[in-house]
Amino acid sequence: GTTGRSKGVMLSERNMCASLCTYGARAENWITSRLPEGQKLPLSHMTLLPLFHMACFVCVMSYPPAGWALNLCSDIRDFYRDLGLMHSDIMASAPMLVETVYNDFKRGRVSRLNGLWDLCCSSAALDPKMLLELAQNGFVINQCYGMTETFGDGILNFTQAEKHMSAVGKPDDHVQYKL
């Protein structure tokens, strides 16, 4: 994961491919209902995480088959340069990146984000007030938990409502949870 201690999780090819069906039509329907005015599919996706990280691997396996451009940024020091060169609608966002986007928004530097409007937040719980402020100002916030264990989003919170912004969310359709 991006915020906790490393953990060994056994994933099979079946685990890894099961989520691809979920990312197909269902995900496209979900994202289509949230597109900014004038935006059309396919979209483009930015990831800054290394290729060996599970979240990046999910992006590599999920978005190109749907026809999306996958923009890879290899170094945090090149983030703004790469985002400026490669328009990205959506970004897989570790907590530090979400805070960076929020700080740009607060400082009036949204133009640096080159049209980025959807943040797919993973791992740690973020400040719900910060997420709500982003959501109220045109950003779509997706909170995902359990990616390492499920090779997908695991538990999702797609709501943009204030009372649910701090909730973990609901299980994704492709996941079975056993305690």
Task: Give names to the regions the model predicted.
Residues 1-21, 158:
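Conserved AMP-binding A3 loop
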Residues 31-41, 59-179:
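Conserved adenylate-forming
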Residues 13-14, 49, 175:
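Structural detector for helix-capping/boundary residues
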Residues 42-53, 96:
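Conserved AMP-binding
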Residues 18-22, 26, 150:
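Hydrophobic transmembrane alpha-helices of multi-pass small-molecule transporters
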